[in-house]
């Protein structure tokens, strides 16, 4: 069963530091943790001109960057409004034990 825990506080109050510690602690206990970080800015992983950027610009719904040790998934939603946290979580992998927001 997946659990969701939200952290709320002023900037600089230690939310990220606490989350880092909890991720390590939960991982040591064999649990998988995902995180959601809200940003007030557009999220850009790619660099203009790179293949993955070009695929996204062409209209690909998902672009997956894969290397020997990692995978990064970027989805593009054509939305006019901000996604609710419930909508975000519904799009995430459901095989984790905890999601920290």
Outline where the language-model segments fall.
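Phosphate-binding/switch loop-helix module in NTP-utilizing enzymes
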Residues: 76-101
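Conserved lysine of the Walker
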Residues: 15
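Post-Walker A alpha-helix
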Residues: 18-19
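N-terminal phosphate/diphosphate-binding loop that engages ATP/GTP or pyrophosphate donors
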Residues: 23-80
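The conserved Walker
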Residues: 11
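Walker A (P-loop) ATP-phosphate-binding motif of ABC ATPase nucleotide-binding domains
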Residues: 4
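Hydrophobic anchor at the beta1->P-loop junction of P-loop NTPases
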Residues: 7
